Regions:
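Structural detector for short beta-strands of small beta-barrel domains
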Residues: 12-31
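Conserved hydrophobic positions within beta-strands
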Residues: 18-20, 148, 180
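A short macromolecule-binding patch
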Residues: 35-48, 169-177
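Short nucleic-acid-contacting surface segments enriched for D/E, G, S/T with interspersed K/R
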Residues: 50-67
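OB-fold/S1-family single-stranded nucleic acid-binding modules
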Residues: 73-95
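Short, non-transmembrane alpha-helical segments in secretory-pathway proteins
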Residues: 126-148
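Exposed beta-strand-loop-beta-strand "reactive/processing" segments of non-cytosolic proteins
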Residues: 147-177, 184
Length: 185
């Protein structure tokens, strides 16, 4: 089944990484490295980790670095997993740096790394579950600062990870081994 891959696709698997603030019993605010604010809602099924160890919501404190995975709907994520003090990886970047969104600020038309040759905006199938989580984590490790609002599996087996709230990159390409291979506007 093919889904149209556009900003109005509805809630889908995604996530964000940043600093927690305004912590309450039902969630918190996450501020990304580019200043984007994302509302994080807790669900009864939300799991928590501190680094790589199981934790509870009490691990989330103001100022703590967090990685949130879940269902993204615009600037709100209903969390399935919250990782406090996420482990830092050794992800390699195909180039470029995240350009935060600012009204009137120009983005970039830069294309870096490998863009799948058969990639066509709007093609592919929405990914979910562990697959979407792994692609989201890989994309955010290389290009933090935005919010991933969907992961699309392409016909060649790669993933297009859609990044919102930034001027660049909007499309982050991740291979089947969950390594970032390219990015574009």
């Amino acid at each position: 089944m093919l889904f149209r891959s556009n900003a109005r696709s509805g809630p889908a698997a995604g996530g964000s990484v940043g600093t927690a603030s305004g912590v309450t019993s039902s969630g918190f605010t996450l501020t990304t490295s580019t200043g984007q604010q994302v509302t994080i809602k807790e669900a009864s099924s939300t799991t928590y980790e501190q680094g790589t160890s199981p934790a509870s919501i009490s691990a989330v404190t103001s100022g703590a670095p967090v990685l949130v995975l879940g269902t993204t709907d615009s600037s709100t994520i209903t969390a399935s997993q919250v990782i406090v003090d996420p482990p830092s990886g050794s992800a390699s970047s195909p180039g470029g740096q995240t350009i935060g969104y600012a009204k009137g600020k120009q983005g970039s038309t830069e294309k870096v790394g490998t863009i799948p040759s058969d990639y066509s905006q709007g093609s592919g199938t929405l990914a979910s579950g562990t697959t979407a989580d792994k692609a989201t984590e890989a994309a955010l490790a290389v290009y933090p600062g935005g919010t991933i609002d969907r992961v699309v599996k392409l016909s060649n087996g790669d993933y297009e990870v859609h990044n919102i709230g930034v001027n660049w990159p909007h499309h982050i390409f991740v291979n089947a081994d969950f390594q970032v291979i390219g990015a574009d506007d």
